[in-house]
Amino acid sequence: MYFLPIWFQAVKGVDAEKSGIMSLPNIGSVTVFSMIAAAVTQIEGHYSPWIILSSVLMAIGGGLLTTLKVDSGHAQWLGYQFLSGIGSGFGFQGPVIAVQTVLEMQDIASGVVIVYFAQSLFGALMVSVGQDVLTNELLKNLKIQLPFMDPRVVTDAGASGFRSSVSAADLPKVLLAYNAAVTKVFYIPVALACASLVGALVIEWKSVKGKKAEPEDV
C-alpha cells in the first residue's frame, strides 16, 4: 500500500503527515491480524488456510481500491484498505512458518533468510514498477484531460504541491487524471494476489504441531 498515501495527498489534498495518519487502518490491521493468524496457527496447527485466505482477501481489497474515485468518502477508503490489510496480515508470517515447519532443522535458518530476502527484493522491485506505471499513466491522463497544458507543471510539483501550480478551472481534471493513475497502480497488487493464490493452494499442508526438534548427533 505504498501508493495509498500518494492518493490521499494528490486526490484528497492532505499533507504527508495527514496521509500517513489516514493510512493507519491498513498498517494497524496488518499488525493485529498477523498476530491473530500466528496465535491461532500455534493453537490449531495449520498455516495453509491463512495463506489461502490472505491471497483471497488481498485480491478483493486491492480490487476495491481500484474503484476509488475523487469523491470517495471515508467508508470507501477506510474499509477497502482495512480489508486489504487484513489479507496482508493473515499471510504476513505464513511463509516463514511454512519454512520452519517443512524444512529440516539444519535448513531452517537458510530458508528463513531466503524468504526475507525474496520479500524485500520483490517489494522494492514492485515499488519501482508501480512508480513507472503511476508516472506513465499520469502523463497519459493529463494529455487527455488537458491537452494544451504542459504535464510537467503537475509532475514536477509532486502529489502534494500541484494544487498551487494549476488553475482552479483545471484542478478538477487534474484530480481525475491523478485518481485514474494511482488506481491503475492498484491493479498490480491485485494481479500479484491472484497469482499468489496458485502457490497458496499447492503449498504443503502440514501442522506446526508435528515439528519436533531432532537431537544432535554426538
Q: Where do the model's predicted regions map?
A:
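Membrane-interfacial segments
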Residues: 12, 44-48, 137-142, 146, ...
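Mature extracellular catalytic domain of secreted serine hydrolases
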Residues: 3, 149-153, 157-165, 169-170
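Transmembrane core module of solute transporters
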Residues: 1-110, 203
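Small-residue-rich alpha-helical segments with characteristic i,i+4
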Residues: 77-154, 184-188, 201
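Interhelical loop segments of eukaryotic multi-pass membrane proteins
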Residues: 18-22, 143-148, 211-217
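Structural signature of transmembrane alpha-helix termini at the membrane-water interface
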Residues: 35-39, 63-67, 132-140, 198-209
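Generic preference for well-ordered alpha-helical elements
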Residues: 1, 33, 96, 108-114, ...
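Transmembrane-helix exit segments and adjacent C-terminal regions of multi-pass membrane proteins
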Residues: 160-218
